[in-house]
Structure formats: structure tokens, C-alpha cells
């Protein structure tokens, strides 16, 4: 399929959970971050690419695997339907995603190379991460061993710590938004709900099972929500299911606010202690959100075997190495039908004004 077909793609704005939270005193010491400032990004056009496959779908679009025609490099192209973005009032989230990704550079965060829009779609050209979603590996295995969960938790902590150092709250931590690269290291993706913190934010957004109590109660929220979500994620990785679940969101919210956690018997004492301290309803007492910030999490006994200098340098041995046949391999992603997703009507010029700098 030729690149003009790109201009018709619609992007995977992941069905995610969105969360925010509040800020602790004192700047945490960061995981040493091999952050290399990217050179000025190249300028592309849609005609530079061939569309090869759809690797994700979402509320108002798709993510495509594309191949640059000349250099033969592979990228992920996120294509969002402007009419759907406007209808769902997601304009600010789209701008947030672009601004956050332009600001960050970290081994465990997805890279953004180029953005564009026409009269129907918004486009974000990002690195292609061929290992697929952590969610798929968790679903296939049922649950992870303690050492496997420890590895992913350590890399995620370094990513969260880096974002918080830049006053950015991620608000969408979940297995579906964690990709594995060809070596098995993580890449956080989908920054549609990430937000630069000026003060507390009040938006209710996110997947019910991962929402922090302060989000549900509309008390304003900031960094602490990411540490809450980490507690949920660790529980889910090691158990195979989240700690708070119900048939409907209201039931989930009630259980979150009650804060009662039923641990599977196989979890060891230290990880249960860590999860309890991350899932403290009072955010002022939540691990990661107190005076020492992320250091309190990294120094917890469950992480006693982790070399925190080595983590962001990608020196820890990944427990899962994806099976990848080549750079453009899509076998680790779901297969999506190439249906009539590209039927969005052109948007009037006045409605495009909000996207003029995209």
C-alpha cells in the first residue's frame, strides 16, 4: 500500500486509563539516565512511507507499521481522526502527547520523530517497537514470576522517576502501554494522558482498575497517581489479575476507596509490603510521594538485589526476549482488519485552527 493510504489512517489512541496526582517535597535523586539529546529531527512527508500493517487500534484511530521508501527504516505511524478527536473532546490530550514526547529522551520511553496533519487526520511518526505489548506476554503466561516482575518494575520505576523529574505525570501505566523492544527492555508508549504539572490537575481519566483514590474523589492529583498505578501493576504482573475488580466501574471505585487488598498466597512478604505501601489511600503517606520520592521505592527490600546504576543503562538481563524475524516483524502484535477506518470527512478550516501547530 502506498503512503497516500497513510493519510487515511486513524490512530490507536489507546483505551487507557488516565491519572494524575500531587507533588512531594524535595527532588528525588534520579536513576542515572543516559539521556542523549536528539539532533534536530528530519522533516518527512507522508509520501516518504509505505504502509505495511496495522499494529494497534483505539478510540479514534490506528497505529500503522510504515517503511521509509529510501532509507528502508521502519516506524510506527499513529493516525488520529480529527472529527473523532473533536467529537470526544480530546484536543488537549493530543497536544499534551506531542509536547511531552518532544521534551523527553530516555531509553525506556517511546521516541517521537515527526508530526503532521491534513484536513482529516493527525499523524505522529514514532519508533517502531517490535516486541509487542507486555500485556500479551502476561496474558499468555497467566502471571509472571517474582524475578520477572522485579525486572519490569525496576525499568518502569526509572521511567517514572525520569518523567517526574521533568514535572510530567504519566497517568496511564498499565500492561497494554508497556512495549518490549527487540532485546526485551521496556518502552512506555501512549502519552495521550501525560501532563506537565503546574499545579494539581483535576481531570478524571483512566481505566477503572488503575485509578488512584484521589482521582475518583476529584481531590486533585499529581505524581502520586503513578506510584499507585505501579502498585496495581506489580500486583497484576505477579497475580494475573488486578487487586480491585468488579463487574462495573462503580463497584471497582468502592473497592479502591476501601483499600482492602486480598493477596494470593504465593506472593512473598517483601512484595506484599511494597504493594501495601504503594496502595496507600492517603497520598501523603504513599511510597514514592514522600520526602525522598522515588528513592523510597528503590530502597525497598523487594528491590534489594537491583543495581540501580545498571537499570537505565539496559544492563540487566531481560527475562523475556521477543521472537523477532526482522525489523519489520509484526508477529508480536494482534492482527487487525483493514476495514473502512479511513472514511473521515474533511474538517472545516475553522475547526483545524486548534491543530495549526501540530
Curated annotation (Swiss-Prot):
Entry-linked CDD domains: STKc_PRKX_like
Pfam families: Pkinase (PF00069)
Activity regulation information from UniProt: Binding of cAMP to the PRKAR1A or PRKAR1B regulatory subunits induces dissociation of the holoenzyme heterotetramer. The released monomeric PRKX is then active and able to phosphorylate its substrates.
Residues holding ATP: 55-63, 78
Induction remarks: Up-regulated by phorbol 12-myristate 13-acetate (PMA).
Catalytic residue list: 172 (proton acceptor)
Gene Ontology annotations for the cellular component aspect, listed alphabetically: cAMP-dependent protein kinase complex; cytoplasm; cytosol; nucleoplasm; nucleus
InterPro entries, per database record: AGC-kinase_C, Kinase-like_dom_sf, Prot_kinase_dom, Protein_kinase_ATP_BS, Ser/Thr_kinase_AS
Tissue: Widely expressed (at protein level). Specifically expressed in blood by macrophages and granulocytes according to PubMed:9860982.
EC nos: 2.7.11.1
Gene Ontology biological-process entries: angiogenesis; cell adhesion; cell-substrate adhesion; endothelial cell migration; endothelial cell proliferation; epithelial tube morphogenesis; kidney morphogenesis; myeloid cell differentiation
Reaction(s) catalysed (UniProt annotation): L-seryl-[protein] + ATP = O-phospho-L-seryl-[protein] + ADP + H(+); L-threonyl-[protein] + ATP = O-phospho-L-threonyl-[protein] + ADP + H(+)
Consequence when changing residue 93 to Q: Constitutive kinase activity
PTM text: Phosphorylated; autophosphorylates in vitro.
Keywords: Acetylation, Angiogenesis, ATP-binding, cAMP, Chromosomal rearrangement, Cytoplasm, Developmental protein, Differentiation, Kinase, Nucleotide-binding, Nucleus, Phosphoprotein, Serine/threonine-protein kinase, Transferase
Location of the AGC-kinase C-terminal domain: 304-358
Membership in a protein family: Belongs to the protein kinase superfamily. AGC Ser/Thr protein kinase family. cAMP subfamily.
Subunit annotation: Like other cAMP-dependent protein kinases, the inactive holoenzyme is probably composed of 2 PRKX catalytic subunits and a dimer of regulatory subunits. Interacts (cAMP-dependent) specifically with the regulatory subunits PRKAR1A and PRKAR1B. Compared to other cAMP-dependent serine/threonine protein kinases, does not interact with the 2 other PKA regulatory subunits PRKAR2A and PRKAR2B. Interacts with cAMP-dependent protein kinase inhibitor/PKI proteins; inhibits PRKX. Interacts with GPKOW. Interacts with SMAD6.
Function statement: Serine/threonine protein kinase regulated by and mediating cAMP signaling in cells. Acts through phosphorylation of downstream targets that may include CREB, SMAD6 and PKD1 and has multiple functions in cellular differentiation and epithelial morphogenesis. Regulates myeloid cell differentiation through SMAD6 phosphorylation. Involved in nephrogenesis by stimulating renal epithelial cell migration and tubulogenesis. Also involved in angiogenesis through stimulation of endothelial cell proliferation, migration and vascular-like structure formation.
Record-given protein name: cAMP-dependent protein kinase catalytic subunit PRKX
UniProt organism field: Homo sapiens (Human)
